[in-house]
């Protein structure tokens, strides 16, 4: 029986942060079973070279490398090089880009290294990734390192449990909040009532969530009830250590290799400077904290000037536990561990709803007095204290109302009857994104919602980009034959705008409410400037996606020729996930033309974060920096939000496109992208 990696580490000296460059181009990895014990939880885990995580692979940009993987398991395996731009046949997804590695067989991956930065590898077979088949990748730049540091550490954040993935899935299919032991209760009602401004608002909040068969406290599907959160596979009671000397510059390469957990990372008393996101350099951003989604990577630099220990604190998003480490000038020296923040509580914003105009009696399963929810009453709703304040860059109730955003000549009050607009027919409106089955033409549509300088969303429209406002509408469903844009009051088009026909739009419209889709976000908003649930009022500088600006412009300056709109959907009660209301088994491939420039727009109809990963390509997140939009391989889609990214389909083949919460992917939130 092999000795557990954590047992080996317990007697080893802490790493000193000096990683010699590698000249190795031929690698051999063995996948097999190793008995691993972490925090008293023992598992006969699938491992690479008998360790969790697997060995660090260090490459150099411009080289061609060869990696032979031998499978000693009794089942198929594979390795995917997460974030690396490789040929499709080397991407490592069985059944899609290759046949997988059968028991007793080997496969040699061979590909050129076209990039540099921090990445990782993991299995794409049989949920082996959830049990430890992971490892880090560092790629040195072909040119001299632009951010030289005295020390360099890899920090892999993860979870550990001895409960099998199959059992976890079975439990959540039986009861979606099976691992949520922090439900609201009768005992918590007085405190909630005090927070919400009275018993009635608190009860209304609970009734709304009950009517939707959802829980406002269900933040993470799987929690610290069974997970031990780890840092480099070391439990918090031991904690990872890294040495330093005062005054040194230290590079920390954070990789979220977890199965289901988003982490909020900080080092109390020490400023971090973000220098790279998903391996790509960004303009330096000084921060106190950042949220890292599953599969994301961030490189930060710290420079401690005091000769004492600093705690690396990575709390789970649901605040049921944390991973722990220490930067220390001497072995065994520790710093205080900060308390965890209060647990986040979801609001109707996370459901993509217009909170001012909600009529609770019309919600499924609700029978309430005729008392509409107004903006004045929203101040008493649960967790509104967690909403950003007016001087922040995030959405407030005032900014969501946005009376100053009304278009000249257009009455935008929420009693507006769209049926009176020329050419607007009942058939046309019913097919517009955001319209619900049975919604009449004269029903309230709500106000325009502010998103970002480049994103304005009108209820009933998908308009993530002002320069192609009409492109997000289902133009075929509208009778426009006798109507020009110039005829619409207050909608004179700038002469520099491209004609609406310049952008081909693939928009399926909102998915139906059925067994596979529990909710439609009628008012999705841009949340790129929002640090995430639970982080808005911490008095700490928290990284947001709007802070990320690439150091170099996009290599492809072309505008997109096509926009593909995808809804992220699911049914929490049945634990089913998908795109556009369909599971993977019910969906065909997304077909792209070779070298096509495409915009993907994601509308999150669920109350959960989804880290979305497109294999094989950079996703250029449209966060307002134009040519300097950051290039990422994994992007968090926040609940009730809309966002978009550009990509260039410059590599032919079949590619995976999925949520990187493993159980969401396994239960349907997976698509294929075909480039030919």
Positions of the model-derived regions?
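Surface-exposed, short loops/turns at beta-strand junctions within beta-sandwich domains
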Residues: 114-115, 304-306, 650-651
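A conserved active-site cap/scaffold subdomain adjacent to cofactor or substrate pockets
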Residues: 255, 299-311
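A short beta-strand micro-motif common to beta-rich folds, especially ectodomain repeats
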Residues: 121-124, 309-316, 655-660
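Histidine-centered copper-binding motifs that mark active-site loops
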Residues: 2-294, 301, 331-448, 454-459, ...
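Short, acidic/polar linear motifs in exposed loop/turn regions
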Residues: 73, 258-259, 306, 606-608
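Active-site pocket scaffolds in enzymes
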Residues: 26, 39-40, 83, 89-98, ...
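Intrinsically disordered, low-complexity acidic Ser/Thr-rich regulatory segments
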Residues: 204-232, 472-549
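Short acidic/polar inter-strand loop motif in beta-rich domains
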Residues: 127-133, 309, 316-324, 663-668
